[in-house]
């Protein structure tokens, strides 16, 4: 018998017709992991800590995580950009330490009726002021307006003309929740009522970061291609890097889960450079934003994760540059990084963003990887798209091999077996890999097929006759990053003048 059947026996005697199904040549699916956000829920929230929870909507996140909680805000920021993708969250216990505070000190007496516009992160709070209100009355109005919105990252108290905003959770993250007055300024109709003066100053510095080991354990072996991490301290980033590593982590040959971590940090140029220099991790993207960016760092991380998910799901090799971080408020004009400063950040492993017409957009999603094991400059893992493309290619190969050859026999090239037999040889697999490469070339994932074929090696293992060894040398397509023009102008071509 030449044809290999899976179920129909070769010695059946009962008439007549038998058929079995075989889907090994039908699979055209593309494997992709979901998104994951890690963060704090309210202390009285119903969500179980360190457990994977599927979140379908912002309202559901508010319900189970608590309004105003870090996770609820991150889900809200994520869904602004990716309203469709599959999203999970893991709530981590609040760290020991201190909750960050911000003080708004009110002075003067209102000589006109108006509104105080306080921005806590991206959200504007409007506190009414009546002519004749003194500092204490204005402070109470601000406090009441803040507490009337349960979705804010702060709660408020007031005393003797001073409003104290306290972050809902303890930890370093609270130091990166911006508070300002009149973000849009006079041109946007935001001015303080005459006679009222308000100063904004940092109070207690947030301290502490959660231990993420149990959260990592909760991830198990579920695939997550896009992981949003709000904690940018060294210990938290290194914990996630261990989970992602190539030896025993998600990128190892044993687990083959892949994925990429996105985090964010706001600060001065020197602060961001110092942060980038701490790491050399190809599976981590740390995006740096100006200190005056009017969006909390945790929401920036969630938004960038969402943008990557939307773009990379469609095409892993296409650059994420220009991607809009929907509804994220950038730093105001005059307080944004210059091109020179952006170049510095990108040279120190910090991903960048830019602003066009008031919209915050991705400039370049690099990883923190900069040097090889000897400390020599290495750009092999510079761009996150390279990692996403690698995951796509490896999953594609796995899909082809496991779908078509999951129960095949292995023989040497030149073996004279009958057509229809479930047997592969190195040459058969080589042809299959070449065909798959051609398909990916047409899809714009790889290039240079002829050179790929020249360097491709498929051979039977000399010590294990059941094993095929493959050297698979793809040439990934690249991204258009720089368009350089030498404008060699003339006042008039001499030929024309003649």
Which sequence ranges carry the predicted segments?
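Threonine/glycine-rich low-complexity segments that form extended coil/beta-edge repetitive scaffolds
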Residues: 20-21, 25-69, 79-140, 169-223
